[in-house]
Amino acid sequence: MQSSLARPLRPPVLAGCGGRRGHGAPRGSVSVARCRAEAAPPTVGTASRAPAGPYTGRDPEVKKPAWLRQRAAQGDKYARLRESIGELKLNTVCVEAQCPNIGECWNGGGGAGGEGDGIATATIMVLGDTCTRGCRFCAVKTSNKPPPPDPLEPLNTALAVASWGVDYVVLTSVDRDDLPDGGSSHFAQTVRALKELKPGILVECLTSDFRGDLEAVSSLANSGLDVYAHNIETVRSLQRIVRDPRAGYDQSLAVLKHAKDCREGMITKSSIMLGLGETDEEVKQAMIDLRAIGVDILTLGQYLQPTERHLTVREYVTPEKFQFWKEYGESVGFRYVASGPLVRSSYRAGELFVQNLVRNNKTGSSSS
Protein backbone atom coordinates (compact mmCIF):
# COMPACT_ATOMS: atom_id res chain seq x y z
CA MET A 1 0.00 0.00 0.00
CA GLN A 2 1.39 3.36 -1.01
CA SER A 3 -0.13 6.82 -0.66
CA SER A 4 0.55 10.01 -2.59
CA LEU A 5 3.43 10.48 -0.15
CA ALA A 6 5.32 8.63 -2.87
CA ARG A 7 5.32 11.76 -5.04
CA PRO A 8 8.99 12.63 -5.63
CA LEU A 9 10.37 15.80 -4.09
CA ARG A 10 10.67 18.47 -6.74
CA PRO A 11 11.67 22.12 -6.78
CA PRO A 12 8.41 23.96 -5.98
CA VAL A 13 6.69 26.57 -8.10
CA LEU A 14 7.62 29.24 -5.58
CA ALA A 15 11.21 30.14 -4.89
CA GLY A 16 12.71 29.86 -1.46
CA CYS A 17 14.23 26.69 1.55
CA GLY A 18 10.46 23.19 9.01
CA GLY A 19 9.94 23.59 12.71
CA ARG A 20 7.97 21.15 14.53
CA ARG A 21 7.22 19.24 17.64
CA GLY A 22 5.34 18.39 22.49
CA HIS A 23 1.79 17.71 23.36
CA GLY A 24 -0.54 17.33 26.28
CA ALA A 25 0.48 15.37 29.36
CA PRO A 26 -1.68 14.08 32.20
CA ARG A 27 -2.00 15.39 35.72
CA GLY A 28 1.28 15.25 37.60
CA SER A 29 3.62 15.46 34.64
CA VAL A 30 5.30 18.12 32.57
CA SER A 31 6.95 17.63 29.24
CA VAL A 32 10.03 19.81 28.98
CA ALA A 33 10.87 18.58 25.50
CA ARG A 34 12.52 19.54 22.28
CA CYS A 35 12.38 20.37 18.63
CA ARG A 36 15.38 19.02 16.80
CA ALA A 37 17.11 21.83 14.94
CA GLU A 38 19.83 20.94 12.48
CA ALA A 39 21.21 22.34 8.70
CA ALA A 40 24.00 24.02 6.86
CA PRO A 41 25.43 26.68 9.19
CA PRO A 42 25.08 30.37 8.38
CA THR A 43 27.84 32.96 8.47
CA VAL A 44 30.13 32.58 11.47
CA GLY A 45 29.02 34.57 14.47
CA THR A 46 25.56 35.46 13.22
CA ALA A 47 22.21 34.14 14.33
CA SER A 48 19.80 33.48 11.50
CA ARG A 49 17.14 31.16 10.15
CA ALA A 50 17.59 28.25 7.75
CA PRO A 51 18.98 29.31 4.36
CA ALA A 52 16.84 29.28 1.24
CA GLY A 53 17.45 26.52 -1.26
CA PRO A 54 15.80 23.76 -3.30
CA TYR A 55 12.69 21.90 -2.12
CA THR A 56 11.36 25.05 -0.43
CA GLY A 57 8.48 27.48 -0.87
CA ARG A 58 4.74 26.79 -0.86
CA ASP A 59 3.16 24.13 -3.06
CA PRO A 60 -0.10 25.63 -4.42
CA GLU A 61 -1.46 22.12 -5.02
CA VAL A 62 -1.26 21.21 -1.32
CA LYS A 63 -3.90 22.92 0.83
CA LYS A 64 -3.87 22.91 4.63
CA PRO A 65 -6.82 20.80 5.82
CA ALA A 66 -9.35 21.79 8.46
CA TRP A 67 -8.07 19.25 10.99
CA LEU A 68 -4.82 21.22 11.33
CA ARG A 69 -6.39 24.61 11.98
CA GLN A 70 -6.21 25.73 15.61
CA ARG A 71 -7.29 28.71 17.66
CA ALA A 72 -4.72 31.22 18.85
CA ALA A 73 -3.25 30.26 22.22
CA GLN A 74 -4.98 31.81 25.22
CA GLY A 75 -6.27 30.84 28.67
CA ASP A 76 -5.21 31.44 32.27
CA LYS A 77 -2.80 28.48 32.51
CA TYR A 78 -1.16 29.51 29.26
CA ALA A 79 -0.72 33.07 30.47
CA ARG A 80 0.65 32.00 33.87
CA LEU A 81 3.14 29.54 32.41
CA ARG A 82 4.34 32.00 29.79
CA GLU A 83 4.90 34.59 32.52
CA SER A 84 6.70 32.08 34.77
CA ILE A 85 9.00 30.87 32.00
CA GLY A 86 9.79 34.45 31.05
CA GLU A 87 10.67 35.39 34.61
CA LEU A 88 12.95 32.35 34.92
CA LYS A 89 14.62 33.20 31.59
CA LEU A 90 14.09 29.65 30.34
CA ASN A 91 14.08 28.80 26.63
CA THR A 92 11.12 26.79 25.37
CA VAL A 93 10.95 24.95 22.10
CA CYS A 94 7.21 25.63 22.14
CA VAL A 95 7.96 29.26 21.25
CA GLU A 96 11.28 28.90 19.41
CA ALA A 97 10.04 26.17 17.06
CA GLN A 98 6.51 27.59 16.65
CA CYS A 99 4.90 24.40 17.95
CA PRO A 100 1.21 24.15 16.95
CA ASN A 101 0.32 22.57 20.30
CA ILE A 102 1.46 25.42 22.54
CA GLY A 103 -2.07 26.42 23.57
CA GLU A 104 -3.23 22.89 24.32
CA CYS A 105 -0.05 21.88 26.12
CA TRP A 106 0.31 25.01 28.23
CA ASN A 107 -3.36 24.80 29.20
CA GLY A 108 -2.91 21.28 30.55
CA GLY A 109 -4.58 19.42 27.70
CA GLY A 110 -7.62 21.65 27.48
CA GLY A 111 -7.11 22.94 23.95
CA ALA A 112 -5.74 26.24 22.68
CA GLY A 113 -8.37 28.39 24.33
CA GLY A 114 -9.46 26.51 27.46
CA GLU A 115 -8.03 24.76 30.49
CA GLY A 116 -7.69 21.02 30.90
CA ASP A 117 -7.38 18.91 34.01
CA GLY A 118 -3.71 18.02 33.55
CA ILE A 119 -0.47 19.76 34.47
CA ALA A 120 0.52 22.33 31.86
CA THR A 121 3.16 21.06 29.47
CA ALA A 122 6.15 23.21 28.48
CA THR A 123 9.19 22.49 26.38
CA ILE A 124 12.48 23.74 27.79
CA MET A 125 15.76 23.80 25.89
CA VAL A 126 19.03 23.73 27.78
CA LEU A 127 22.30 24.93 26.23
CA GLY A 128 20.68 28.12 24.97
CA ASP A 129 18.26 28.94 22.17
CA THR A 130 20.66 28.99 19.21
CA CYS A 131 21.56 25.84 17.27
CA THR A 132 24.80 25.21 15.40
CA ARG A 133 22.86 23.36 12.72
CA GLY A 134 20.09 24.51 10.43
CA CYS A 135 17.88 21.66 9.25
CA ARG A 136 15.44 22.73 6.59
CA PHE A 137 12.41 21.73 8.66
CA CYS A 138 13.17 23.65 11.85
CA ALA A 139 12.42 27.23 12.91
CA VAL A 140 15.00 27.47 15.72
CA LYS A 141 17.65 30.12 14.99
CA THR A 142 21.16 29.03 14.07
CA SER A 143 24.75 30.24 14.38
CA ASN A 144 28.25 28.79 14.10
CA LYS A 145 29.19 30.53 17.36
CA PRO A 146 26.24 30.72 19.76
CA PRO A 147 26.77 32.22 23.23
CA PRO A 148 28.53 29.92 25.72
CA PRO A 149 26.28 27.80 27.96
CA ASP A 150 25.19 29.39 31.24
CA PRO A 151 27.03 27.46 33.99
CA LEU A 152 24.11 28.08 36.35
CA GLU A 153 21.53 26.74 33.89
CA PRO A 154 21.53 23.11 35.16
CA LEU A 155 20.75 24.17 38.72
CA ASN A 156 18.30 26.92 37.74
CA THR A 157 16.43 24.57 35.41
CA ALA A 158 16.25 21.91 38.13
CA LEU A 159 15.00 24.43 40.69
CA ALA A 160 12.32 25.66 38.30
CA VAL A 161 11.08 22.20 37.33
CA ALA A 162 11.15 20.99 40.94
CA SER A 163 9.04 23.98 41.97
CA TRP A 164 6.32 22.94 39.51
CA GLY A 165 5.71 19.74 41.51
CA VAL A 166 5.75 17.37 38.55
CA ASP A 167 6.79 13.71 38.49
CA TYR A 168 7.84 13.38 34.82
CA VAL A 169 9.94 15.83 32.85
CA VAL A 170 11.40 15.90 29.34
CA LEU A 171 14.55 17.95 28.77
CA THR A 172 15.96 18.87 25.39
CA SER A 173 18.61 21.04 23.80
CA VAL A 174 19.78 22.65 20.62
CA ASP A 175 22.76 21.12 18.81
CA ARG A 176 26.08 22.48 20.10
CA ASP A 177 28.75 21.36 17.63
CA ASP A 178 30.91 24.20 18.97
CA LEU A 179 31.41 22.38 22.29
CA PRO A 180 33.95 19.53 22.65
CA ASP A 181 31.34 17.04 23.86
CA GLY A 182 28.39 18.60 22.07
CA GLY A 183 26.99 19.75 25.42
CA SER A 184 26.59 16.24 26.83
CA SER A 185 28.18 17.07 30.20
CA HIS A 186 26.01 20.18 30.62
CA PHE A 187 22.94 18.11 29.81
CA ALA A 188 24.02 15.43 32.29
CA GLN A 189 24.56 18.04 35.02
CA THR A 190 20.95 19.16 34.56
CA VAL A 191 19.68 15.59 34.93
CA ARG A 192 21.74 15.01 38.08
CA ALA A 193 20.56 18.31 39.58
CA LEU A 194 16.95 17.30 38.95
CA LYS A 195 17.43 13.86 40.49
CA GLU A 196 19.16 15.38 43.52
CA LEU A 197 16.39 17.89 44.16
CA LYS A 198 13.60 15.38 43.48
CA PRO A 199 14.84 11.75 43.53
CA GLY A 200 11.52 10.27 42.41
CA ILE A 201 11.17 12.35 39.27
CA LEU A 202 11.31 10.55 35.91
CA VAL A 203 13.51 12.30 33.35
CA GLU A 204 13.35 11.96 29.58
CA CYS A 205 16.09 13.58 27.49
CA LEU A 206 15.55 14.37 23.82
CA THR A 207 19.09 14.80 22.56
CA SER A 208 21.21 15.71 19.59
CA ASP A 209 23.45 13.11 17.96
CA PHE A 210 26.61 14.60 19.55
CA ARG A 211 28.23 14.20 16.10
CA GLY A 212 28.16 10.44 16.66
CA ASP A 213 30.44 10.69 19.72
CA LEU A 214 29.40 7.57 21.65
CA GLU A 215 31.35 8.64 24.74
CA ALA A 216 29.14 11.73 24.92
CA VAL A 217 26.10 9.47 24.50
CA SER A 218 27.33 7.26 27.35
CA SER A 219 27.93 10.25 29.62
CA LEU A 220 24.33 11.39 29.27
CA ALA A 221 22.81 7.90 29.23
CA ASN A 222 24.51 7.15 32.57
CA SER A 223 23.54 10.46 34.20
CA GLY A 224 20.41 9.02 35.78
CA LEU A 225 17.87 9.73 33.02
CA ASP A 226 15.02 7.28 32.47
CA VAL A 227 14.17 7.69 28.77
CA TYR A 228 16.74 8.43 26.07
CA ALA A 229 15.11 10.05 23.03
CA HIS A 230 16.75 10.94 19.73
CA ASN A 231 14.87 11.56 16.49
CA ILE A 232 15.70 10.10 13.10
CA GLU A 233 13.25 12.75 11.77
CA THR A 234 12.56 11.17 8.36
CA VAL A 235 13.18 8.13 6.19
CA ARG A 236 16.63 7.21 4.91
CA SER A 237 16.22 8.59 1.36
CA LEU A 238 15.27 12.09 2.55
CA GLN A 239 17.94 12.59 5.21
CA ARG A 240 20.23 14.88 3.19
CA ILE A 241 17.28 16.97 2.01
CA VAL A 242 15.62 17.33 5.42
CA ARG A 243 18.50 17.35 7.92
CA ASP A 244 21.81 19.13 8.31
CA PRO A 245 24.68 17.33 6.47
CA ARG A 246 26.29 16.60 9.84
CA ALA A 247 23.30 14.46 10.80
CA GLY A 248 22.55 11.08 9.28
CA TYR A 249 20.26 8.07 9.41
CA ASP A 250 22.90 5.52 10.40
CA GLN A 251 24.50 7.92 12.86
CA SER A 252 21.15 8.42 14.60
CA LEU A 253 20.54 4.67 14.73
CA ALA A 254 24.01 4.20 16.25
CA VAL A 255 23.23 6.78 18.95
CA LEU A 256 19.96 5.07 19.86
CA LYS A 257 21.54 1.61 19.89
CA HIS A 258 24.43 2.74 22.08
CA ALA A 259 22.08 4.48 24.51
CA LYS A 260 20.05 1.26 24.77
CA ASP A 261 23.20 -0.76 25.45
CA CYS A 262 24.50 1.64 28.11
CA ARG A 263 22.22 0.46 30.85
CA GLU A 264 19.86 -2.42 31.43
CA GLY A 265 16.26 -1.23 31.46
CA MET A 266 16.92 1.91 29.41
CA ILE A 267 13.85 3.06 27.48
CA THR A 268 14.64 4.56 24.06
CA LYS A 269 12.42 6.68 21.86
CA SER A 270 12.41 8.28 18.40
CA SER A 271 10.18 10.32 16.10
CA ILE A 272 9.36 10.59 12.40
CA MET A 273 7.77 13.46 10.46
CA LEU A 274 5.37 12.61 7.64
CA GLY A 275 4.35 14.66 4.62
CA LEU A 276 7.83 15.29 3.19
CA GLY A 277 7.57 12.95 0.21
CA GLU A 278 8.31 9.60 1.84
CA THR A 279 6.64 6.40 0.63
CA ASP A 280 4.71 3.95 2.77
CA GLU A 281 7.39 1.31 2.27
CA GLU A 282 10.07 3.74 3.45
CA VAL A 283 8.11 4.53 6.61
CA LYS A 284 7.68 0.82 7.31
CA GLN A 285 11.40 0.24 6.81
CA ALA A 286 12.26 3.08 9.18
CA MET A 287 10.03 1.51 11.84
CA ILE A 288 11.65 -1.88 11.30
CA ASP A 289 15.12 -0.33 11.56
CA LEU A 290 14.19 1.33 14.86
CA ARG A 291 12.75 -1.87 16.28
CA ALA A 292 15.85 -3.80 15.22
CA ILE A 293 17.90 -1.74 17.70
CA GLY A 294 15.30 -2.04 20.45
CA VAL A 295 13.60 1.37 20.33
CA ASP A 296 10.56 1.19 22.62
CA ILE A 297 8.55 4.34 21.89
CA LEU A 298 7.74 6.02 18.56
CA THR A 299 5.91 9.22 17.69
CA LEU A 300 4.72 10.18 14.21
CA GLY A 301 3.38 13.60 13.25
CA GLN A 302 2.66 15.87 10.30
CA TYR A 303 5.47 18.12 9.10
CA LEU A 304 4.29 21.74 9.15
CA GLN A 305 6.20 24.40 7.23
CA PRO A 306 7.10 27.41 9.43
CA THR A 307 7.95 29.76 6.51
CA GLU A 308 8.44 29.65 2.74
CA ARG A 309 12.18 29.34 3.38
CA HIS A 310 11.62 25.92 4.92
CA LEU A 311 10.87 22.58 3.27
CA THR A 312 7.70 22.34 1.23
CA VAL A 313 4.86 20.18 2.58
CA ARG A 314 4.28 17.45 0.00
CA GLU A 315 1.15 15.98 1.58
CA TYR A 316 -1.13 16.49 4.56
CA VAL A 317 -1.53 12.98 5.90
CA THR A 318 -5.07 12.16 7.05
CA PRO A 319 -5.95 11.25 10.65
CA GLU A 320 -7.05 7.85 9.34
CA LYS A 321 -3.60 7.20 7.85
CA PHE A 322 -1.98 8.21 11.13
CA GLN A 323 -4.18 5.63 12.86
CA PHE A 324 -2.92 3.05 10.36
CA TRP A 325 0.67 3.93 11.28
CA LYS A 326 -0.12 3.62 14.98
CA GLU A 327 -1.51 0.12 14.45
CA TYR A 328 1.38 -0.86 12.20
CA GLY A 329 3.90 0.38 14.76
CA GLU A 330 2.27 -1.67 17.48
CA SER A 331 2.23 -4.72 15.20
CA VAL A 332 6.02 -4.59 14.70
CA GLY A 333 6.67 -4.40 18.42
CA PHE A 334 6.83 -0.81 19.66
CA ARG A 335 5.69 -0.69 23.27
CA TYR A 336 4.01 2.68 22.76
CA VAL A 337 3.12 4.59 19.58
CA ALA A 338 1.69 8.11 19.41
CA SER A 339 0.58 8.95 15.87
CA GLY A 340 -1.49 11.91 14.69
CA PRO A 341 -1.34 15.11 12.62
CA LEU A 342 -0.30 17.30 15.56
CA VAL A 343 1.74 14.72 17.46
CA ARG A 344 5.25 15.91 18.27
CA SER A 345 8.28 14.31 19.95
CA SER A 346 7.06 14.93 23.49
CA TYR A 347 3.42 14.08 22.82
CA ARG A 348 1.97 12.60 26.01
CA ALA A 349 5.53 11.98 27.15
CA GLY A 350 4.54 11.62 30.78
CA GLU A 351 1.21 9.89 30.46
CA LEU A 352 0.51 7.13 32.95
CA PHE A 353 1.31 4.28 30.56
CA VAL A 354 4.79 5.65 29.82
CA GLN A 355 5.47 6.30 33.50
CA ASN A 356 4.47 2.74 34.35
CA LEU A 357 6.59 1.43 31.48
CA VAL A 358 9.66 3.20 32.86
CA ARG A 359 9.04 2.13 36.45
CA ASN A 360 8.33 -1.49 35.48
CA ASN A 361 11.56 -1.57 33.48
CA LYS A 362 13.45 -0.27 36.50
CA THR A 363 11.92 -2.93 38.72
CA GLY A 364 12.67 -5.69 36.23
CA SER A 365 16.29 -4.68 35.70
CA SER A 366 16.99 -4.29 39.42
CA SER A 367 15.58 -7.73 40.26
CA SER A 368 17.35 -9.58 37.44
Curated annotation (Swiss-Prot):
Question: What's the cofactor?
Answer: [4Fe-4S] cluster
The principal localisation class reads plastid
- SUPFAM superfamilies recorded for this chain? Radical SAM enzymes
User: Which family is it part of?
Assistant: Belongs to the radical SAM superfamily. Lipoyl synthase family.
**Misc remark for this entry?**
This protein may be expected to contain an N-terminal transit peptide but none has been predicted.
What are the BP-aspect GO terms?
lipoate biosynthetic process
Q: Which HAMAP family match?
A: Lipoyl_synth, Lipoyl_synth_plantC
E.C. no: 2.8.1.8
What GO cellular component entries does it have?
Answer: chloroplast; mitochondrion
The Radical SAM core domain sits at 114-335
Source species, domain of life: Eukaryota
Output this protein's name.
Lipoyl synthase, chloroplastic
Keywords, comma-separated and alphabetical: 4Fe-4S, Chloroplast, Iron, Iron-sulfur, Metal-binding, Plastid, S-adenosyl-L-methionine, Transferase
* Keyword Chloroplast applies: yes
Asked if S-adenosyl-L-methionine is a keyword of the record, the answer is yes
**Residues engaged in binding [4Fe-4S] cluster 2:** 131, 135, 138
Q: What class of enzyme is it?
A: transferase
Compartmental location: Plastid, Chloroplast
GO MF, one annotated term: metal ion binding
